[in-house]
Amino acid sequence: MVSSVLSIPPQTCLLPRLPISDSVNCKSKIVYCLSTSVRGSSVKRQSTARTRSFTETNRRTPSVQSKHEFWEDPDDGSDSENEYEGEEEDGIGNDLDNESDWEDDSRVQKLTTTDNYEEELAKEVEQLLEPEERVILQQNEKPNLKMISTKSWKPLQTLALSMQIQLMDNLIENGLDIDDVDKDNQTALHKAIIGKKEAVISHLLRKGANPHLQDRDGAAPIHYAVQVGALQTVKLLFKYNVDVNVADNEGWTPLHIAVQSRNRDITKILLTNGADKTRRTKDGKLALDLALCFGRDFKSYDLVKLLKIMPTGDI
């Protein structure tokens, strides 16, 4: 507790006046409050007067600077907390810097470890090989396309289905035709679409794969995209100006396949991009005929309505 001794002239006021110090730095001005309280409610009257100096004493903690004679707020620890916060922020920054350095060191160490492993693996494998096997390996510094390919099993098609994009690029860079076909006259793009490998599809198209080539049955990549329900692939193929009305050997267009698979979204996309509703298959079927053949159910009605009311090329 802080004790104070204050001398008040008796003629000034009948009620005791309590000194209220300014919370920051009051010099020699004291604000007095004349207060009366009735059950917790008070009426305060403020007045300012200049009085003589008073002396504050505190046996445990001095809180008065005697030279300037003013109240001093007790230390609430706020400055210390701010200092700690600053230290913590500095610590966080240092930790981030250290972590970044650690990541760089770790990355370099990982690359070094990988290089060392590859060298050790090469030495180990060459020791395991028979002399004639070692000769074959030494003769094929680049991929031997004839040795790794048959008419049924083409390396590019296999890698497309297994999503080995880097190895695909390696073969293409070493002379393999990106549109190389297998016994079914299907390219790697055909296979990727059938397997719904969207990343491979995009990569092959960017590398120059032909999206118009038809396989042994006359099916183009868009036929297979519609068949497997790959809506995003269908949209992507339209960006490469594929023929929406291309027909296979039996006269089936992508629209016929979309209705057969009862895929409303793809049917609508095809119609939006100019699919011809009047095109017939070689046995005379319209896309509408295929929709009616499924009987009376919701999807049939939905497709029939779409085919009846939506003009070709409507957006």
From Swiss-Prot:
Transit peptide, UniProt annotation: 1-39
GO molecular function: molecular condensate scaffold activity
Polar residues composition-biased segments: 44-65
Tissue-specific expression: Expressed in roots, inflorescence stems, flowers, siliques, dry seeds and mature cauline leaves.
ANK repeat feature ranges: 151-180, 184-213, 217-246, 250-279, 283-307
Residue spans of biased composition, Acidic residues class: 72-104
GO CC terms in record: chloroplast
Swiss-Prot/TrEMBL keywords: ANK repeat, Chloroplast, Plastid, Repeat, Transit peptide
Signal peptide: none
Region ranges (Disordered): 44-106
Primary site of residence: plastid
Subcellular location: Plastid, Chloroplast
Keyword Plastid recorded: yes
Domain of life: Eukaryota
Function: Involved in the initial differentiation of the proplastid during the embryo development. Also required for correct cotyledon, true leaf and cauline leaf margin development.
Subunit-level organization: Interacts with AKR. No homodimerization observed.
Classification via PANTHER family: ANKYRIN REPEAT DOMAIN-CONTAINING PROTEIN EMB506, CHLOROPLASTIC, ANKYRIN REPEAT FAMILY PROTEIN
Name of this protein: Ankyrin repeat domain-containing protein EMB506, chloroplastic
Species per Swiss-Prot/TrEMBL record: Arabidopsis thaliana (Mouse-ear cress)
